């Protein structure tokens, strides 16, 4: 029995550019075979739609991979119900891992503007995929040098040594090691890997600034998650994911055991107090 949203997802996938579509079909078929329900709710986007998203803060740039048929947006599902807070659930992680193995880049790995629903197929760079010519014999994603990519050598090394291999942490490490404007290129990753292996000392990254008193009301500057506890772990990430510009009423403050401030929202869930991510209004 096919999942509730399979036909809708397939129809959207079929709008994609040739090689992106081939990879997305493999991903969708794999998820069906493994009992992982998703809704691929958007693929192709018009310039007018993208402009509206930029104006609303939902998107950061007009240079969207949706415009060239190389991106899709998804949400985890169970029957008719979609779950915007399940991107880092067990099934969500498996789906994202499979997508990455097929050559997709996940917006949830990005620093600053985190975009959990977003998967983009870089192929040979922005706008390099085709329409109506069929997938190439080797349709793996081959990002250009300026594309935000992961080097398996670097990530594997960090994971093996129990280091945080997220893009955000790699960017912090790169800055502390003197690697400017880190974007995850192969050259930058190779340099960072060499410095990590050499164990060269580095200066700590700049300290984060937090609200320490109740700001009463804040607006999110980036996509933010809500947690049922001051401990921001995947297990506690049950309050949903909210886009930039979302306004929250703050009823109180909390702190982790390590002393990191948290904002307690009116709903009872906790939100980051980091001034890089939320702003008092």
Curated annotation (Swiss-Prot):
<dbReference type="GO" id="GO:0008233">
    <property type="term" value="F:peptidase activity"/>
</dbReference>
<keyword id="KW-0964">Secreted</keyword>
<dbReference type="Pfam" id="PF19087">
    <property type="entry name" value="DUF5776"/>
</dbReference>
<dbReference type="GO" id="GO:0071555">
    <property type="term" value="P:cell wall organization"/>
</dbReference>
<keyword id="KW-0378">Hydrolase</keyword>
<dbReference type="InterPro" id="IPR044081">
    <property type="entry name" value="DUF5776"/>
</dbReference>
<keyword id="KW-0961">Cell wall biogenesis/degradation</keyword>
<comment type="similarity">
    <text>Belongs to the peptidase M15C family.</text>
</comment>
<comment type="function">
    <text>Cell wall lytic enzyme. Hydrolyzes the link between L-alanine and D-glutamate residues in certain bacterial cell-wall glycopeptides.</text>
</comment>
<dbReference type="InterPro" id="IPR039561">
    <property type="entry name" value="Peptidase_M15C"/>
</dbReference>
<dbReference type="InterPro" id="IPR009045">
    <property type="entry name" value="Hedgehog_sig/DD-Pept_Zn-bd_sf"/>
</dbReference>
<protein>
    <recommendedName>
        <fullName>L-alanyl-D-glutamate peptidase</fullName>
        <ecNumber>3.4.24.-</ecNumber>
    </recommendedName>
</protein>
<dbReference type="Pfam" id="PF13539">
    <property type="entry name" value="Peptidase_M15_4"/>
</dbReference>
<dbReference type="GO" id="GO:0005576">
    <property type="term" value="C:extracellular region"/>
</dbReference>
């Amino acid at each position: 029995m096919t999942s509730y949203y399979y036909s809708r997802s397939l129809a959207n996938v079929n709008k994609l550019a040739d090689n992106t579509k081939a990879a997305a079909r493999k991903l969708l078929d794999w998820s069906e075979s493994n009992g992982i329900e998703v809704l691929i709710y958007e693929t192709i986007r018009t310039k007018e739609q993208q402009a509206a998203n930029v104006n609303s803060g939902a998107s950061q740039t007009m240079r969207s991979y949706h415009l060239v048929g190389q991106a899709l947006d998804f949400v985890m599902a169970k029957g008719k119900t979609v779950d915007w807070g399940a991107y880092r659930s067990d099934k969500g992680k498996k789906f994202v891992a499979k997508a990455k193995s097929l050559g997709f880049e996940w917006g949830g790995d990005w620093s600053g503007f985190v975009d959990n629903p977003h998967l983009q197929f870089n192929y040979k760079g922005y706008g390099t995929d085709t329409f109506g010519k069929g997938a190439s014999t080797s349709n793996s994603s081959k990002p250009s040098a300026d594309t935000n990519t992961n080097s398996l050598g670097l990530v594997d090394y960090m994971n093996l040594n129990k280091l945080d291999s997220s893009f955000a942490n790699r960017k912090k490490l790169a800055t502390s090691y003197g690697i400017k404007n880190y974007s995850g290129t192969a050259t930058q990753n190779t340099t960072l890997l060499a410095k990590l292996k050499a164990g060269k000392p580095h200066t700590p990254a700049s300290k984060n600034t937090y609200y320490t008193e109740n700001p009463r009301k804040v607006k999110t500057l980036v996509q933010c998650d809500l947690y049922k506890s001051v401990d921001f772990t995947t297990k506690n990430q049950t309050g949903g994911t909210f886009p930039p510009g979302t306004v929250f009423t703050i009823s109180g403050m909390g702190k982790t055991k390590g002393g990191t401030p948290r904002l307690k929202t009116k709903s009872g869930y906790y939100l980051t107090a980091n001034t890089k991510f939320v702003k008092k209004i």
